[in-house]
Amino acid sequence: MKRILLTNDDGFDSSGLLALKDALKDIAHVMVVAPASEKSACGHGLTLTRPLSFVQLDDDFYKLEDGTPSDCVYLALNTLYKASCKPDLVISGINLGSNMGEDITYSGTAAGAMEGCIQGVPSIAISQLMPDKNCSKHFDFSLAKECIYKITQLIFAKGFPLGERKFLNINIPHIKPKECKGYKITQMGYRIYADNAHLHRNPRGQEYYWLGLHPLEWEERNDMPHSYGSDFKATHEHYVSITPIKLDMTSYEDSSSLCEWIQL
């Protein structure tokens, strides 16, 4: 039977993670290793300055005390799995909210998939657009579950479609399954960020800040080398967005001009 490792950045008790586990339980042996608390926007951080420990909650279900999604994947692949029986797939999600455009550089969900592909395992990050996390407990993940089930079955049948150090980033629109127009292969769009630092004062008059969540605003890119639209546009038009992501962030098109510029 195929083996899948699941993680996320919303924490081990997230409704999105539990929905993901439920979607895949009949087609693979599923192990869950997730952070003990929410780690949203933690990026690809590894914990190097304090010890980490697993807490087993059920058969093949663990939380990692004070760990990040990258910690979860790294430790699971190097301790819970034997070298001869690594999982066939790492899936990070289902995130409560989108991970599109440059947001993936902040995303713990994307980082879980990044760590999987760094460790040599085909990996997927999947996120569900929603108005806010307050609605997540009663959210209907039917479309996301249907999508990840189909894509996982396709991977098992045909193999992973990307090469080394690349992963799939999937975003599910906030619509009912019957409203979905299908799937689109996309490119990362441009997220528009606004000043959303909120100044407050405690009872002693000391200032502190809360970083708010930016409204999901974006602009379509005009520098795309291919005809694919953006992840933002696809979900806005009621398509499931599937973006191939590579970890090599070298700007190759700038190499020649940089060589000329550096001649001092």
Curated annotation (Swiss-Prot):
The keyword Hydrolase applies. Its cofactor is a divalent metal cation. Its EC number is 3.1.3.5. It catalyses: a ribonucleoside 5'-phosphate + H2O = a ribonucleoside + phosphate. SUPFAM superfamilies: SurE-like. It is found in: Cytoplasm. Gene3D superfamilies: Survival protein SurE-like phosphatase/nucleotidase. Pfam families: SurE. GO terms for molecular function: 3'-nucleotidase activity; 5'-nucleotidase activity; exopolyphosphatase activity; metal ion binding; nucleotide binding. A divalent metal cation binds at residues 9-10, 40, 95. The keyword Repeat does not apply. Binds 1 divalent metal cation per subunit. Belongs to the SurE nucleotidase family. Nucleotidase that shows phosphatase activity on nucleoside 5'-monophosphates. HAMAP family: SurE. This is 5'-nucleotidase SurE. The lineage of its organism: Bacteria, Pseudomonadati, Campylobacterota, Epsilonproteobacteria, Campylobacterales. The gene is surE.
